[in-house]
Swiss-Prot record:
It is found in: Nucleus. The modification Phosphoserine is found at S139. Keywords: mRNA processing, mRNA splicing, Nucleus, Phosphoprotein, Spliceosome. Belongs to the NTC complex (or PRP19-associated complex), composed of at least CEF1, CLF1, ISY1, NTC20, SNT309, SYF1, SYF2, and PRP19. GO terms for biological process: mRNA splicing, via spliceosome. The keyword Acetylation does not apply. This is Pre-mRNA-splicing factor NTC20. Its main location: nucleus.
Amino acid sequence: MPSLRDLSLERDQELNQLRARINQLGKTGKEEANDFVGLNISNEPVYDTVIQTGQSSNATNSFVQETIQKTKQKESGQPYIIPQKNEHQRYIDKVCETSDLKAKLAPIMEVLEKKTNEKIKGIIRKRVLQEPDRDNDDSG
């Protein structure tokens, strides 16, 4: 059974070999590196390649779209603004959603309140009718 030291030395050697290959590819030039990857994109805009890759894999996630948008704006020289909602806008959205829910529940709450009030009044009436007259007991 190999020791931990032997395994770590072997791993380090493999990593060094991979680093050497990467450095060698970087030195051999752009064309050879493109051939190694299997793409010839030296004259294509980057976002076209990203679009083709995204369409071929049916990727419609926000990361791909954001990357495409950033690249287009970099190439056109326009600054890229990330469309994020700030904290205030999120709070406003929550308040609007809460208001919408309250508006939908308002008629139901009114009916429930009326029924509850009627039940309370009915219970009070029953207790009043069941209790003996206190006014007559005090006079005697």
